[in-house]
Amino acid sequence: CKTSQKSASSEVTFFKLTESVHQWQQPIGDWKEVGVIQLRDGDNSAFKVEKGRGIFLNHPDAQTVNLLSHAQHGDVSLHVEFTVPEGSNSGVYLQGRYEVQVLDSWGKTDIGHGDCGGIYQRWIGGRGLEGHAPKINASLPPGEWQSFDIVFRAPRFNQSGEKIENARFLKVVHNGVPVHHNVSLNGPTRSASFDDEQPLGPIMLQGDHGPVAYRNIIVRPLNLD
């Protein structure tokens, strides 16, 4: 689904990545589209679901592969809504390379880069580097729908293909609370789909760390030159 909205000064084009599983590259593993999702009765670590559309679920009580969008993006504004059960873990990767962490971090007071809303660390030479903790723990309880609103500036390259500017998270807002501002990234974060850096790349949803569901993924390409 691609929509254009015109104002007196500009045209804004956006598209949703939760219209069809066909918007995502094969294989999609156990990911499927459902209509309703709730915590399982008596078990906050798993989901129960009802048939329908609009919600992408990796698995009610386990894990599967990561999802990579067919669509490629550079500079972008991204809105994404997600829910995890108790103790579960996922992540949203811009360009398949740079992760904003999804985790059940409800109630934690000592938070780090690996908590929900964190920009995950890089992994070089067997050790972690450069992770960025969210400024505030804005997490909601397990099973509640949460949101990220992200403004991302892609890395820049010269005509020889050499990187001349780092990728940056200009803004990350978690459940309406700003948690990052203008964070520069020296390279892909841990468990990225690609080790290199490029002007364009796909959205990646991590599905191999536990149950997670996503809805209302809205991608708005930008030009941040």
Question: Model-found features: residue ranges?
Answer:
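Carbohydrate-interacting regions of secretory-pathway proteins
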Residues: 1-225
